[in-house]
Amino acid sequence: MSPKILPGTPAPLGATSGPHGTNFAVSSAGEQVTLCLFDADGAEERLVLPERDGDVWHGLVPGVEPGQLYGFRVDGPYDPAGGLRYNPAKLLLDPYARAIEGQVRFGPELLGHATDNPSAPSPLDSADHMPRGVVLASAPAPTASRPQHALADSIIYEVHLRGFTAAHPDVPPQLRGTYAGLAHEAALNHLVRLGVTAVELLPVHQNVPEEFLIRRGLTNYWGYNTIGFFAPHAGYSAAARA
């Protein structure tokens, strides 16, 4: 076992920062899972997760703090006919990542199979073409209480987060189309005047536009191409824009 990684725990899944480092846990039926840590220059350090409970691989890395970029590589059989496409040349996102940084750069590097032979694994490394998960500090428990509206009295307003405040004259320009814009007093007052009791947001998970849209200079405005269900879409962050 590498001295840089300890057994850790199988729960919770994802990256969990604590006083002794960060615990990484991911579910995979593969033969080996490798944690990939990236520095600010993109240099990669690989650590094999040392423990497995059922199909959950896990390890605790001392010294890893919030802000660390990471991903996984998984070894196993490459048998497309049997539904198995393990390929350690491909960097994988943590499905439980709570933040994702970077963009998908479409190209042959993202293909799991060789470009000239779909039955053979691709040897091209995909790390430079993939976004990475971001280790976050544990968030404090919410203190605000929710309104106790009866279901029969509820008025649910479905809204696209960016579109709702993109042109609102009373929301500051730097906040329009962001989470902070939706939470701005002017936006909330507008909802209250309408009699709305609950807001249902269209997709706010981290998403990417499809390749054919990018080729046409377009984007997936609605966000229905999620790559991380636990990571808020960074493009809606006012802080990320600043």
Question: Where are the model-predicted features located?
Answer:
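Short proline/glycine-enriched turn/loop motifs at strand-loop junctions of beta-rich domains
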Residues: 27-33, 64
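Carboxylate/His-rich catalytic cores and anion/metal-binding grooves
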Residues: 191-218
